């Protein structure tokens, strides 16, 4: 874990466009800080993650199939070129580019450690939660377009 993340709800209130982007930021920063509360705040209970063709359906499947493996690593995830399309009052789409660095847990600062640097594209559908007012990821497709380094750093 790097540094503690900011709280789930930020002040002052964000515009819808910023709040939509913040849902993605909450999701990826939660990996980097191993913040389960932040991660849970970013997704709906019935969210779907399609990671390079592997489908995980429901928050629990995403948590156990993705989050627990990545959160124990030394990582940084960066999102850029974000485009937000608000399709309805409580629905939106986002596309963006992602860059992520991965080291085995505790090895990020060790010179010569194996790593994987990956670039990819995200296509995300989001909804605004009527209960807490937060925008959340409903369907998240991640396609890795290139990788540099050792994929074995993901070894379980």
UniProtKB/Swiss-Prot annotation:
Name the record gives this protein: Terrestric acid biosynthesis cluster protein E
Membrane-crossing segments per the record: none
Organism: Penicillium crustosum (Blue mold fungus)
Described function: Part of the tra gene cluster that produces terrestric acid. The clavatol biosynthesis cluster cla and the terrestric acid cluster tra are both involved in the production of peniphenones and penilactones. The non-reducing PKS claF is responsible for the formation of clavatol from successive condensations of 3 malonyl-CoA units, presumably with a simple acetyl-CoA starter unit, and 2 methylation steps. The esterase claE probably collaborates with claF by catalyzing the hydrolysis of ACP-bound acyl intermediates to free the ACP from stalled intermediates.
Disruption phenotype: Does not result in significant changes in sencondary metabolites production.
The protein's annotated pathway: Secondary metabolite biosynthesis
InterPro entries, A to Z: NTF2-like_dom_sf (IPR032710), SnoaL-like (IPR037401)
Name of encoding gene: traE
Superkingdom assignment: Eukaryota
Pfam family, one: SnoaL_4
